[in-house]
Design a protein with these regions (language model features):
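C-terminal-biased regions
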Residues: 1-122
Length: 122
């Protein structure tokens, strides 16, 4: 196994449990944004944004491995979801933000499942 592949596999191994935590956090914040806002919801959103950014960095560094045989996660779709999330956040619209988080959660889940599959079959 060459160094780049080993680094990609290691990154994916770390990403799997992290994606699980971020996915759960997204689900929680979606509930808060749908009428159950808490005092710290905005701080929670910022923390989740940081986690999503890290996941995107790992995705960008492993995209060739993830999409080795076919396009499993489309970069343009991911970018569109992130753009929608940013627009909803800037609009300060909780309903739009919850919907946008739902799309990003789909990406996080797909990335986690793909990463798990790759690391299980290394």
């Amino acid at each position: 196994m060459d160094d780049l592949l080993a680094q990609q596999i290691e990154a994916l191994e770390v990403a799997v449990p992290y994606c699980e935590r971020i996915s759960n956090a997204i689900g929680n914040v979606m509930e808060e944004l749908n009428g159950h806002r808490q005092e710290d919801t905005d701080e929670y959103i910022t923390s989740i944004f940081n986690g999503i950014n890290w996941i995107i960095e790992v995705y960008n560094g492993t995209r060739e491995l993830i999409n080795k045989d076919s396009v499993i996660i489309d970069k343009d779709s991911v970018n569109a979801s992130i753009f929608k999330l940013n627009a909803a956040y800037n609009a300060k619209n909780d309903v739009m933000l919850s919907d946008a988080f739902g799309e990003v959660k789909d990406f996080v889940t797909k990335f986690m499942e793909t990463a798990r599959s790759i690391t299980d079959n290394k």
